[in-house]
Protein backbone atom coordinates (compact mmCIF):
# COMPACT_ATOMS: atom_id res chain seq x y z
CA UNK A 1 0.00 0.00 0.00
CA UNK A 2 1.40 3.37 -1.04
CA UNK A 3 1.19 6.08 1.59
CA UNK A 4 -0.22 9.40 0.29
CA UNK A 5 1.99 12.50 0.25
CA UNK A 6 -0.24 14.19 2.81
CA UNK A 7 -2.62 12.75 5.40
CA UNK A 8 -6.37 12.88 4.95
CA UNK A 9 -6.62 14.97 8.11
CA UNK A 10 -4.25 17.04 10.21
CA UNK A 11 -6.13 17.22 13.49
CA UNK A 12 -6.03 14.65 16.28
CA UNK A 13 -9.30 13.52 17.86
CA UNK A 14 -9.06 13.42 21.69
CA UNK A 15 -10.76 10.01 21.80
CA UNK A 16 -7.95 8.51 19.69
CA UNK A 17 -5.64 8.95 22.68
CA UNK A 18 -7.82 6.46 24.56
CA UNK A 19 -9.70 4.13 22.22
CA UNK A 20 -7.44 4.49 19.16
CA UNK A 21 -4.06 3.82 20.71
CA UNK A 22 -5.34 1.12 23.05
CA UNK A 23 -7.28 -0.83 20.41
CA UNK A 24 -5.55 -0.92 17.02
CA UNK A 25 -2.73 1.23 15.64
CA UNK A 26 -3.37 -0.02 12.11
CA UNK A 27 -6.97 1.23 12.14
CA UNK A 28 -5.71 4.49 13.65
CA UNK A 29 -3.12 4.88 10.87
CA UNK A 30 -5.70 4.17 8.14
CA UNK A 31 -8.05 6.74 9.64
CA UNK A 32 -5.50 9.55 9.47
CA UNK A 33 -4.00 8.78 6.06
CA UNK A 34 -7.04 7.51 4.15
CA UNK A 35 -10.01 8.76 6.22
CA UNK A 36 -10.99 5.10 6.38
CA UNK A 37 -12.77 3.89 9.50
CA UNK A 38 -15.71 1.78 10.56
CA UNK A 39 -18.72 3.94 11.35
CA UNK A 40 -20.41 2.89 14.56
CA UNK A 41 -24.06 3.56 15.33
CA UNK A 42 -25.27 4.01 18.92
CA UNK A 43 -28.89 5.22 18.59
CA UNK A 44 -29.52 5.70 22.33
CA UNK A 45 -26.16 7.20 23.31
CA UNK A 46 -26.66 10.68 21.86
CA UNK A 47 -30.16 11.42 23.27
CA UNK A 48 -29.10 10.14 26.71
CA UNK A 49 -25.89 12.18 26.63
CA UNK A 50 -27.74 15.28 25.40
CA UNK A 51 -30.27 14.98 28.23
CA UNK A 52 -27.48 14.71 30.80
CA UNK A 53 -25.59 17.70 29.42
CA UNK A 54 -28.71 19.87 29.14
CA UNK A 55 -29.58 19.14 32.76
CA UNK A 56 -26.35 20.75 33.99
CA UNK A 57 -26.23 23.82 31.78
CA UNK A 58 -25.75 26.93 33.97
CA UNK A 59 -25.61 24.69 37.04
CA UNK A 60 -23.39 25.58 40.02
CA UNK A 61 -20.22 23.49 39.95
CA UNK A 62 -20.87 22.36 43.51
CA UNK A 63 -24.20 20.90 42.36
CA UNK A 64 -22.12 18.48 40.30
CA UNK A 65 -19.96 17.62 43.30
CA UNK A 66 -19.37 19.40 46.64
CA UNK A 67 -15.59 19.03 46.25
CA UNK A 68 -15.52 21.41 43.29
CA UNK A 69 -14.72 25.09 43.75
CA UNK A 70 -17.44 27.77 43.49
CA UNK A 71 -18.32 28.43 39.88
CA UNK A 72 -20.93 28.01 37.15
CA UNK A 73 -21.21 25.83 34.04
CA UNK A 74 -21.16 28.55 31.38
CA UNK A 75 -20.17 26.70 28.20
CA UNK A 76 -21.09 23.36 26.67
CA UNK A 77 -20.69 21.45 23.44
CA UNK A 78 -18.06 23.74 21.93
CA UNK A 79 -15.21 22.82 19.61
CA UNK A 80 -11.67 23.51 20.77
CA UNK A 81 -8.59 23.48 18.55
CA UNK A 82 -5.00 23.60 19.73
CA UNK A 83 -1.98 25.31 18.28
CA UNK A 84 0.42 22.99 16.39
CA UNK A 85 1.79 20.35 18.78
CA UNK A 86 5.49 20.56 19.59
CA UNK A 87 7.32 17.29 20.31
CA UNK A 88 10.95 17.33 21.52
CA UNK A 89 11.32 20.94 20.39
CA UNK A 90 9.98 20.24 16.88
CA UNK A 91 6.68 21.77 15.75
CA UNK A 92 4.58 19.10 14.06
CA UNK A 93 1.77 19.60 11.56
CA UNK A 94 -0.73 18.12 14.00
CA UNK A 95 -3.31 19.97 16.08
CA UNK A 96 -5.92 18.66 18.50
CA UNK A 97 -9.55 19.21 17.54
CA UNK A 98 -12.38 18.08 19.78
CA UNK A 99 -15.66 19.05 21.38
CA UNK A 100 -16.06 19.07 25.16
CA UNK A 101 -19.28 18.38 27.05
CA UNK A 102 -19.38 20.94 29.87
CA UNK A 103 -17.00 23.72 30.88
CA UNK A 104 -17.32 25.28 34.32
CA UNK A 105 -15.93 28.74 35.03
CA UNK A 106 -14.61 29.07 38.57
CA UNK A 107 -14.65 32.29 40.54
CA UNK A 108 -10.83 32.27 40.64
CA UNK A 109 -10.62 32.65 36.84
CA UNK A 110 -9.78 29.04 36.01
CA UNK A 111 -12.03 26.50 34.29
CA UNK A 112 -13.07 22.90 34.93
CA UNK A 113 -13.67 20.26 32.24
CA UNK A 114 -16.57 17.86 32.81
CA UNK A 115 -16.96 14.85 30.53
CA UNK A 116 -20.46 13.35 30.68
CA UNK A 117 -21.03 9.60 30.52
CA UNK A 118 -24.24 7.56 30.55
CA UNK A 119 -22.75 4.12 30.94
CA UNK A 120 -22.20 1.01 33.03
CA UNK A 121 -18.73 0.18 31.76
CA UNK A 122 -15.78 -0.88 33.88
CA UNK A 123 -13.71 1.59 31.83
CA UNK A 124 -15.53 4.56 33.35
CA UNK A 125 -12.56 5.57 35.46
CA UNK A 126 -10.20 8.50 35.54
CA UNK A 127 -7.13 6.62 34.38
CA UNK A 128 -8.72 5.41 31.13
CA UNK A 129 -10.24 8.74 30.11
CA UNK A 130 -7.44 10.98 31.40
CA UNK A 131 -5.72 11.35 27.98
CA UNK A 132 -8.97 12.47 26.35
CA UNK A 133 -9.63 15.10 29.01
CA UNK A 134 -5.98 16.18 28.91
CA UNK A 135 -6.43 16.78 25.17
CA UNK A 136 -9.27 19.22 25.87
CA UNK A 137 -7.18 20.90 28.56
CA UNK A 138 -4.19 21.20 26.22
CA UNK A 139 -6.39 22.84 23.56
CA UNK A 140 -7.89 25.29 26.05
CA UNK A 141 -4.49 26.25 27.43
CA UNK A 142 -2.75 26.30 24.01
CA UNK A 143 -5.47 27.46 21.60
CA UNK A 144 -4.95 27.84 17.87
CA UNK A 145 -6.40 31.32 18.24
CA UNK A 146 -7.97 33.38 21.01
CA UNK A 147 -7.09 33.64 24.67
CA UNK A 148 -6.06 30.58 26.71
CA UNK A 149 -8.09 29.25 29.63
CA UNK A 150 -6.16 27.77 32.58
CA UNK A 151 -7.65 24.39 33.53
CA UNK A 152 -7.70 23.62 37.26
CA UNK A 153 -9.94 20.53 37.32
CA UNK A 154 -11.07 17.65 35.13
CA UNK A 155 -13.63 14.98 35.88
CA UNK A 156 -16.16 12.43 34.66
CA UNK A 157 -19.85 12.93 35.44
CA UNK A 158 -21.28 9.42 35.22
CA UNK A 159 -24.91 8.38 35.14
CA UNK A 160 -25.53 4.66 35.56
CA UNK A 161 -29.03 3.46 34.71
CA UNK A 162 -30.83 2.14 37.78
CA UNK A 163 -33.99 0.69 36.26
CA UNK A 164 -37.50 2.08 35.98
CA UNK A 165 -38.66 4.51 38.64
CA UNK A 166 -41.68 6.71 39.32
CA UNK A 167 -41.48 10.26 37.97
CA UNK A 168 -43.73 13.26 37.79
CA UNK A 169 -45.56 14.23 34.64
CA UNK A 170 -44.18 17.38 33.04
CA UNK A 171 -43.96 19.21 29.74
CA UNK A 172 -41.17 16.76 28.82
CA UNK A 173 -42.78 13.47 29.87
CA UNK A 174 -46.42 12.43 29.55
CA UNK A 175 -46.41 9.47 31.93
CA UNK A 176 -45.43 8.78 35.51
CA UNK A 177 -42.53 6.36 34.99
CA UNK A 178 -39.05 6.68 33.55
CA UNK A 179 -35.47 5.53 33.90
CA UNK A 180 -33.69 6.34 37.13
CA UNK A 181 -29.94 6.90 37.37
CA UNK A 182 -27.23 6.84 39.99
CA UNK A 183 -24.85 9.76 39.63
CA UNK A 184 -21.13 9.67 40.37
CA UNK A 185 -18.45 12.31 39.84
CA UNK A 186 -14.93 10.96 39.26
CA UNK A 187 -12.11 13.54 39.51
CA UNK A 188 -9.32 13.05 36.99
CA UNK A 189 -5.81 14.04 38.01
CA UNK A 190 -3.65 15.85 35.48
CA UNK A 191 -0.42 14.24 34.29
CA UNK A 192 1.06 16.47 31.60
CA UNK A 193 4.22 14.39 31.17
CA UNK A 194 2.24 11.20 30.54
CA UNK A 195 -0.06 13.04 28.14
CA UNK A 196 2.83 14.43 26.09
CA UNK A 197 4.35 10.95 25.98
CA UNK A 198 1.08 9.57 24.56
CA UNK A 199 0.92 12.40 22.03
CA UNK A 200 4.44 11.55 20.90
CA UNK A 201 3.50 7.88 20.58
CA UNK A 202 0.38 8.69 18.56
CA UNK A 203 2.16 11.11 16.21
CA UNK A 204 5.08 8.69 15.74
CA UNK A 205 2.59 5.94 14.89
CA UNK A 206 0.74 8.08 12.36
CA UNK A 207 3.87 9.45 10.68
CA UNK A 208 5.46 6.00 10.30
CA UNK A 209 4.59 3.11 8.02
CA UNK A 210 1.41 1.09 8.38
CA UNK A 211 1.57 -0.75 11.73
CA UNK A 212 0.43 -4.27 12.55
CA UNK A 213 -3.17 -4.92 13.51
CA UNK A 214 -4.08 -4.89 17.16
CA UNK A 215 -4.38 -8.42 18.55
CA UNK A 216 -7.85 -7.68 19.95
CA UNK A 217 -9.12 -5.45 17.13
CA UNK A 218 -12.58 -6.74 16.22
CA UNK A 219 -12.52 -5.00 12.83
CA UNK A 220 -9.17 -6.39 11.69
CA UNK A 221 -9.90 -9.85 13.08
CA UNK A 222 -13.22 -9.93 11.23
CA UNK A 223 -11.60 -8.87 7.94
CA UNK A 224 -8.86 -11.49 8.32
CA UNK A 225 -11.36 -14.25 9.12
CA UNK A 226 -13.61 -13.13 6.25
CA UNK A 227 -10.70 -13.24 3.77
CA UNK A 228 -9.72 -16.73 4.94
CA UNK A 229 -13.15 -18.05 3.96
CA UNK A 230 -12.10 -17.62 0.32
CA UNK A 231 -15.66 -16.93 -0.83
CA UNK A 232 -16.11 -15.44 -4.30
Language-model segments: residues:
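Metal-dependent nuclease catalytic regions and adjoining charged, substrate-binding loops involved
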Residues: 1-16, 143-232
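Metal-dependent nuclease catalytic cores that hydrolyze phosphodiester bonds in DNA/RNA
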Residues: 1-110
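Short, conserved loop/turn and helix-capping segments at secondary-structure boundaries
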Residues: 50, 126-131
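Hydrophobic, Leu/Ile/Phe/Ala-enriched alpha-helical segments that form helix-helix packing faces
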Residues: 59-64, 140, 144, 206
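Short beta-strand-loop-alpha-helix junction that forms the active-site gateway
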Residues: 116-126
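An active-site-proximal "capping" alpha-helix that borders the catalytic cofactor pocket
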Residues: 130-142
Amino acid sequence: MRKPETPARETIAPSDLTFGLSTCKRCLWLKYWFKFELKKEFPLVKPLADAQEEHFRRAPMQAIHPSLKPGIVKQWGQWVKSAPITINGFETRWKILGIYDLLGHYEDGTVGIIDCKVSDSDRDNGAFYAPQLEAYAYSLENPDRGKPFPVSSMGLLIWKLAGVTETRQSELASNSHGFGVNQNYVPVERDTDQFMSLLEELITTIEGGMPKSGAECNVCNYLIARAELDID
